[in-house]
């Protein structure tokens, strides 16, 4: 039986990803996205979760660190605030932070499993999003209940669909100016394959999702993003435990597309962990590979002359972002 904890060691056996990136081993001078992981608590414990969120996790970002994130966002000229978790709604400062983030004029994205909005204390969240014009990125493993719940667990599909309907009633996914006060309310869905396979063609999958969700549930949305599962965290452990790591990695490496390298998300963003530690992306957070400079968001908040441009830390889970048409 393989040691399922040694995912990083297993990944290191493959051809080094960093050799593939050439001149793109640095970030851009001007970063556009500040991605903030505000906590690892979640009402789900999905099989593919790279950050290993679950109801048992207690890590959460403090208000002080959130305030530092807002300061860095303004000082460094970011244009997008991307809030993730866990289920980010479970952070006690979430609503306050959403209001503060929206007040900056940024494009504010929240990532959600949506079903959290049917749990006690979170029922008002969809109305908050609509009021503030928040962009909602919702994960939906499949439009077929049985397939979706194979990845997420029993009882997860119906509440997700009900909340999606609520969002549509509020004006989400209906095009420009359909929301309150003429806002454009964007609802995007995120699809991850359930096993050791690459995602299907994104355009074809989006057409299929739009047709099925509209016909069966009366749901509209804007975009579908097909994301390859990064071979780290809970998914990486499962690959090792089932003997599928080698097969999956060979698929990723075989599908490497050099045209996706310039647009890797790590080149345009800074990712902040719940405790303020800085990473090149959320996947690097999952395998605990911090930025080379070893800084915390507090360092940048206190000293805004620290350069935003940096060397990027690469490892072999990065193949997931550059397979096929890319997942950044």
Task: Name what the model sees in each region.
Residues 22-25, 255-259, 306-309:
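Short, P/G- and charge-enriched loop/turn segments at secondary-structure junctions
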Residues 2-85, 89-100, 104-106:
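Conserved alpha-helical substructure of the radical SAM core
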Residues 141-265:
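Radical SAM enzyme [4Fe-4S]-AdoMet core and its adjacent flexible, acidic
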Residues 272-273:
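Short, acidic, Ser/Thr-enriched surface-loop or helix-capping motifs
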Residues 30, 45, 77, 132-133, ...:
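Short loop/turn motifs at secondary-structure junctions
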Residues 63-83, 91-192:
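Radical SAM/AdoMet-radical enzyme domain recognition
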Residues 277-328:
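Flexible mid-to-C-terminal extensions adjoining Fe-S/redox cofactors in radical SAM and related proteins
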Residues 42, 46-49, 266, 276, ...:
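Short cysteine clusters
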């Amino acid at each position: 039986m393989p040691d399922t904890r040694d995912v990083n060691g297993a990944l290191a056996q493959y051809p080094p990803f960093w050799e593939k990136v050439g001149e793109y081993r640095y970030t851009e001078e001007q970063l556009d996205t500040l991605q903030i992981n505000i906590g690892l608590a979640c009402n789900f414990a999905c099989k593919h979760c790279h950050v290993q969120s679950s109801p048992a996790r207690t890590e959460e970002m403090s208000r002080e660190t959130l305030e530092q994130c807002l300061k860095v966002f303004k000082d460094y000229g970011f244009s997008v605030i991307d809030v993730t978790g866990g289920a980010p709604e479970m952070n006690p400062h979430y609503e306050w932070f959403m209001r503060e983030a929206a007040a900056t004029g940024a494009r504010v994205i929240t990532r959600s499993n949506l079903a959290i909005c049917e749990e006690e204390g979170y029922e008002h969240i969809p109305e908050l999003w609509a009021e503030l014009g928040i962009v909602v990125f919702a994960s939906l493993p499949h439009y077929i209940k049985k397939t979706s719940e194979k990845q997420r667990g029993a009882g997860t599909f119906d509440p997700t669909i009900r909340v999606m309907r609520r969002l549509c009633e509020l004006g989400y996914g209906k095009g420009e100016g359909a929301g309150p006060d003429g806002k454009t309310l964007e609802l995007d869905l995120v699809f991850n394959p359930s096993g050791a396979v690459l995602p299907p063609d994104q355009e074809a999958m989006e057409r299929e999702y739009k047709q099925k969700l509209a016909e069966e549930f009366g749901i509209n949305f804007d975009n579908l993003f097909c994301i390859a599962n990064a071979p780290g965290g809970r998914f990486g452990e499962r690959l090792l435990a089932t003997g599928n790591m080698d097969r999956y990695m060979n698929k990723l490496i075989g599908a490497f597309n050099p045209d996706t390298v310039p647009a890797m998300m790590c080149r345009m963003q800074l990712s902040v962990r719940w405790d303020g530690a800085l990473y090149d992306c959320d996947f690097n957070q999952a395998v605990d590979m911090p930025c080379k400079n070893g800084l915390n968001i507090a360092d940048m908040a206190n000293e805004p002359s620290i350069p935003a441009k940096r060397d990027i830390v690469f490892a072999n889970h990065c193949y997931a972002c550059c397979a096929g048409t890319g997942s950044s």
